[in-house]
Amino acid sequence: MNTILRTLLFEWKDRKLPSIIERDIRLDTSSQQKINNATVITGFRRVGKTYMLYDAIKKLFETQTREEVVYINFEDERIIAPTTDLLTNLIPEIQAIYGQKPKYLFLDELQLIPYWSKWVRRMLDTESLQIFITGSSSKMSSAELPTELRGRAWEIKVTPLTLKNFYALKM
């Protein structure tokens, strides 16, 4: 599993971000209040949760380096039968590859990893970083947010495009 994790981290170093359509809602990555709290982005499939992460990452790249901002998509087909070890090794692998710990972690579809919420809680308690998580609303909502994260996570619900966004896309 470490080989896959290393591959994903090396690929991230050179990955180009896709074009992004601005939405009415954007992630706030500047607030120091978010350290020791996670931001959980939920919504139906294909409503733009991942692109919301990309938008925030693109904005962060104006002041931060790739080594400080790390994105991992846990829906990657190379992550087969994931275990908690994948998460346990994440920060040490990032540090080994990039030479430093990240300031921002963007974890797409994290709910696919067993015991993910316990790991996030440990990171919030022991590391100084901002964590952004996406998950489909059928698997991760405020009503179903694990008890480990209650009071430690802000939820942002993403809805389908507004009519204004839709027209902007078509223009």
PLM regions and their residue ranges:
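Phosphate-binding site recognition
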Residues: 1-171
